[in-house]
């Protein structure tokens, strides 16, 4: 008797990245990631510029980060409520409108040469950034098969890296290059008038885009394109804050963004004081470090096929503890290379904490997204009130402080990420 071959099951076909009907909408939404990456890192250029032109202290210049990331905290829940009431498209238009309004407010603020007025303008601008970030993640989730949403979000965060790299390059060219020659804020007015015009144009264009019905409309507990929610799943009987892995994700994101905000706020100061770079040149090295962050996201996406995301997160946190120890020694080029390397390991932290925290939340996922985004307030408080007083004496020694933050992120990746199934 001739043995018959046992048929082998075919490997499952991976779900499509997105669908043809969503391509135009997808391009617009992905562009939002680049826009807010640009807006966030531009603030770190202004930090140094305001020190030189407005003669504010290093600690007080960190109010730039406080205004920027504090807006994320303020807008987190309102953006979520607006999105549920009016839908994703109107949420995006609201975010872009606030972004453009804040950019245009920088013009009279620069004319007045008022640090407080400039902070107010940045706060309005960052309210737009926070709204975009709260809306864009669940919006992307609906632009295709839910099984491929992780790939869409990871790809979009890589595009965010392009904007993040562009911020210091553009800011260094327009702003820091002219600091000593002009001694005023005219370059700030030029830069932000261009940004306001571009962002406003995108808002107008997006208002004319016809968004097809989203797949998320058929997922329990998610927003529809027109607003409102679909039915609640039976699996999510617990209240949101009874999900301990979500609560720990909020804590981990708070400390993660605190460390990131502090590192970015004093990067240029470190380059000028310990390596002898000009502010303009240090800004380009900051961009180089953000290229490393973008590469880290692509590499992390690949490695997650073989290594559990929580393990990569824990490893990255340990690596950055070591980097901070090197930076704090101010050993010239060696320490500066370690400072550049911090962003490489930052790369996977925000999206990984975000995705781990949203697992198995059912009807709570949308509100949970807003709370995790609100964790960005750590970047508002830590640079000014924790690192700032130390940086006034020693910028290098201030880099001991983020070690505490990375220890918390490590604990989340090693233990507290687990979903408890009661």
Protein language model features and the residues they cover:
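Cytosolic juxtamembrane N-terminal segment immediately preceding the first transmembrane helix
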Residues: 1-36, 52, 238
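Extracytoplasmic
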Residues: 24-54, 136-137, 167, 263-271
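Extracytoplasmic gate region of multi-pass secondary transporters
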Residues: 43-47, 168, 238-287
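Central cavity-lining transmembrane alpha-helices of secondary-active solute carriers
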Residues: 63-81, 287-299, 378
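Helix-to-loop junctions at the C-terminal end of transmembrane segments
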Residues: 75-88, 175, 296-308, 390
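C-terminal ends and interior cores of transmembrane alpha-helices
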Residues: 97-112, 318-331
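Intracellular juxtamembrane helix-capping segments at the cytosolic ends
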Residues: 131-145, 347-362
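Helix-loop-helix hairpin linking two adjacent transmembrane segments in secondary transporters
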Residues: 146-211
